[in-house]
């Protein structure tokens, strides 16, 4: 698949790109694509938040997050949508994401489940 992406002029969507890949192979695949591909586009989803540590690899407009709104509809927004006071060039995007500054984090609620007062 990588040779197809590098040689061709295509867009390929891949859901959960890191699935069944060693983390080093995942990073190697992305870097190989970014360095060698001139005309193709890779659109990938991931739950691998550690990828946010690689600020040197991705531009802010190439990282997108999803959030569920009150109507349970999925909203999509880019890292580049954030004000510079939230994300600066020197800030750690991974840490900003982990503490909830960027959204896209599930609302887990409490660990305790009260089965007696269940609605």
Task: Describe the residue ranges of each PLM region.
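C-terminal lobe/lid and adjacent interdomain/linker elements of RecA-like ASCE P-loop ATPase modules
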Residues: 28-119
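Conserved D-loop-proximal element of ABC-family nucleotide-binding domains
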Residues: 19-23
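GG-anchored amphipathic helix commonly corresponding to the ABC/SMC/Rad50 NBD signature/C-loop
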Residues: 1-14, 24-28
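Short His-Asn-centered micro-motif
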Residues: 14-16, 45-46
